């Protein structure tokens, strides 16, 4: 009877199957937010001393303690090699895989006590009532209008000079619980090359739930951080950013193959879809 009960439990933990068409552009976030224009009129840099003081309090007194409690005590997230970022004297860029809406929590804990800016979609600053809050917490939206790019790049350079760590998700789109690494472009790797700053990659891996209260978790989460990777100053800019991209990708790929072994959701290309088969649906519960 006990054996049968165990078998039944395993059957209930069915892996969802999602079919995708474009690894670079498919997005399963399902937010459907009407984007506001982020252009040359957008205020990327806040120099108001009172707003900066308020942002400091929100970040260190409220956000970081809440994030720490939720990540470590509720989700039991483990971090490996955080010291690689903490021991750096110069500011760096963080590059991570994008598998959860709460990925934005990881940089704050990886970098602490340093602050982190996170490059985000215009969606993040388009939600009425929270635009100022998310910016105070570090959101730096990528322009959806070409006129905003100059000021945006200036903002990246400004925060880099202020020794704030800047986090980028080169995959751009959320694929919940994805255990692999999606292909991504080298465009965003221009920033560390331009500023001659080191890069640290991090990879969120999912493994079989184990340990205290493991039955309440769909997967154990471990975030692996790379040692610093420096731009090759002997190469032309384009070649240097491609080399950085390839080194970050190689680290993520290695972590994926070694540590990300538990598939809560399985992603398959549409060409693998059997006739008459239907793709499972991404639910709100998948966005931990």
Describe every region a protein language model picked out:
Residues 2-93, 102-106, 131, 136, ...:
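Membrane-anchoring hydrophobic helices of lipid-metabolizing enzymes
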Residues 87-146:
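Catalytic core of membrane glycerolipid acyltransferases/transacylases, capturing the structured
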């Amino acid at each position: 009877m006990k054996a049968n009960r165990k078998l039944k439990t395993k059957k209930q933990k069915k892996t969802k199957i999602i079919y995708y068409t474009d690894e670079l552009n498919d997005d399963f976030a399902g937010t459907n937010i009407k984007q506001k224009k982020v252009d040359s009129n957008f205020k990327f840099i806040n120099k108001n001393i009172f707003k900066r003081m308020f942002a400091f309090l929100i970040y260190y007194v409220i956000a970081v303690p809440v994030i720490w409690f939720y990540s470590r005590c509720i989700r039991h997230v483990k971090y490996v090699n955080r010291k690689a970022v903490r021991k750096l004297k110069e500011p760096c860029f963080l590059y991570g895989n994008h598998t959860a809406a709460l990925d934005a929590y990881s940089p704050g804990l990886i970098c602490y006590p340093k602050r982190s800016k996170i490059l985000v979609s215009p969606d993040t600053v388009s939600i009425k009532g929270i635009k100022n809050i998310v910016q105070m917490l570090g959101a730096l939206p990528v322009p959806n209008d070409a006129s905003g790019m100059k000021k945006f790049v200036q903002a990246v350079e400004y925060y880099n000079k202020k020794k704030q760590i800047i986090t980028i998700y080169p995959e751009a789109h959320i694929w919940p619980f994805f255990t692999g690494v999606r292909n991504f472009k080298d465009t965003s790797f221009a920033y560390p090359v331009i500023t001659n700053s080191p890069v640290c990659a991090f990879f969120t891996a999912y493994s079989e739930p184990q340990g205290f209260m493991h039955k309440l978790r769909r997967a154990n989460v471990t975030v692996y951080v790379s040692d610093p990777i420096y731009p090759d100053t002997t190469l032309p800019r384009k070649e240097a950013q491609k080399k950085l991209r390839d080194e970050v990708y190689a680290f993520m790929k290695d972590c994926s193959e070694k540590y990300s072994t538990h598939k809560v959701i399985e992603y398959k290309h549409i060409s693998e879809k059997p006739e008459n088969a239907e793709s499972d649906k991404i639910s709100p519960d998948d966005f931990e």
